[in-house]
């Protein structure tokens, strides 16, 4: 009874305090109801009571998926140019298959019985066996276990640098030669096989046929790394659609081509970026798994591909060093222009200028192909420690690279960030092709770190014994390759890269058109000149007699004029230290 009276009295006091209304319990109910609704369906709660920011964002066009499964990116801006949600960059390689996969070195297959041997699970005690038979079985098992251990050891040594498998250069007398051979092995390891080239050729041919089927006046051209043989395994393919009449970059045409490719089962994971400065379609070709980017009515990439191939022909060692630097930056996520990294064209320009301005190459003291190791270390030293990013820009003069002060480049003035990389576009002097590489400080640190790592590794292995060198890698200190196991087959000489052939044909056709236009203009001009000459001849015939009558009066002034000319010239000689423009 006492307990009941206490609880009753306490409840009365609470009612008296709130004038007989239990406000506290009502408040709890009001708070709990929206919490339950949010936890059950947050989206409905947001839709009922949107905030001011959400109301503003709802007014903007949203990314959406069309009925045929095409992702339309409406919010892309000029800053998003070059970004790829699958690769992160137009020239950013993806491992094949696309799912993340640990690198596997080429090794002998380990069968189920051998795995059991390694785990010692196959041993069955047989009472009828003699001691000799058991000894033989034990010896055989030990041999098999030893072989398995050797194979596993090889796999461990080559997890991150599989290009050294069966390519031992540890007995080289000069460490620089060891690094040179290892660079060549790496380039051969990642170079395309015949099958890869044929797959890419077939993929482009199929896409081109589909484009021409949709637009008979259009054509598909390849540019970028595939058209120059500077692509890494899994790199995407950059294409451009050009037409006789132009205007294919419109929003409707982007959707039309995307839908057309999807209906023909030539495109999956399709994205249409219509509002960027460079409208583009991104998709994956399902049969090959290759990522493809298609732009419209822009030929500057085709022009750049021709120029780069000329550089490759004239510059020994350019391809090898470019592929090494590309893989180096890719492994560190510094090759994505969208995040401030270095693009493919910028990398090529850096290596090209480095080789063409190297003093020992200019004087023919060294062959670049035989000194790739030293050149790679010096490249990292130049752009990691010594290059003046604050003041110096890279340009070209008569087709050769030059350094010049940033302050004299009016197109990039005013310079907002002095510590930046400035590379003049060889095809457009007003264009800075590296303006998007705002993360140059991290790139410089990476280059400097690579120089330190390589030099330290060279000193370490130089003092090591040949036994300790076995299975070691110099290049592996700065280069990591994680992807599908490959063979050491550079089969570019066995099959033609159609992208290169078609690019060359494009330029030949264009040069013929320009030549024909110039020839037509010259023909019209020469015809007009010939007609004018005949008319002038008929008109000037009568005054010819007057010239004979005036011969004698003109002879005396001629002498005076020659004397005046002589005096004038002699005075100029005194002023210009003997220079006479008339006598040269």
Curated annotation (Swiss-Prot):
Catalyzed reaction equations: RNA(n) + ATP = RNA(n)-3'-adenine ribonucleotide + diphosphate
Cell compartment(s), UniProt: Nucleus
Binding locations of Mg(2+): 236, 238
Binding site for ATP: 301, 326, 431, 435
Keywords: ATP-binding, Cell cycle, Cell division, Magnesium, Manganese, Metal-binding, Mitosis, Nucleotide-binding, Nucleotidyltransferase, Nucleus, Transferase
Residue ranges with Acidic residues bias: 130-139
Compositionally skewed regions (Polar residues) per UniProt: 1-11
The organism's place on the tree of life at top rank: Eukaryota
Compositionally biased tracts (Basic and acidic residues): 53-63, 547-562
InterPro entries: MTPAP-like_central, NT_sf, PAP_assoc, Trf4-like
Effect the entry attributes to changing residue 282 to A: In TRF4-282; lethal
Basic residues bias locations: 12-35
Top EC category: transferase
Reported effect, residue 560 to A: In TRF4-559; slow growth
Region (Disordered): 1-63, 81-147, 525-584
E.C. number(s) listed in UniProt: 2.7.7.19
Gene Ontology cellular component list: cytosol; nucleolus; nucleus; TRAMP complex
Statement: the UniProt record of this protein carries the keyword Glycoprotein: no
Swiss-Prot/TrEMBL cofactor(s): Mg(2+); Mn(2+)
Sequence ranges assigned to domain PAP-associated in this UniProt record: 371-431
Quaternary structure (record): Component of the TRAMP complex (also called TRF4 complex) composed of at least HUL4, MTR4, PAP2/TRF4 and either AIR1 or AIR2. Interacts with NOP53 and POL2. Interacts directly with AIR2.
Protein purpose: Catalytic subunit of the TRAMP complex which has a poly(A) RNA polymerase activity and is involved in a post-transcriptional quality control mechanism limiting inappropriate expression of genetic information. Polyadenylation is required for the degradative activity of the exosome on several of its nuclear RNA substrates like cryptic transcripts generated by RNA polymerase II and III, or hypomethylated pre-tRNAi-Met. Polyadenylates RNA processing and degradation intermediates of snRNAs, snoRNAs and mRNAs that accumulate in strains lacking a functional exosome.
Similarity section: Belongs to the DNA polymerase type-B-like family.
Protein name in the entry: Poly(A) RNA polymerase protein 2
Organism for this UniProt entry: Saccharomyces cerevisiae (strain ATCC 204508 / S288c) (Baker's yeast)
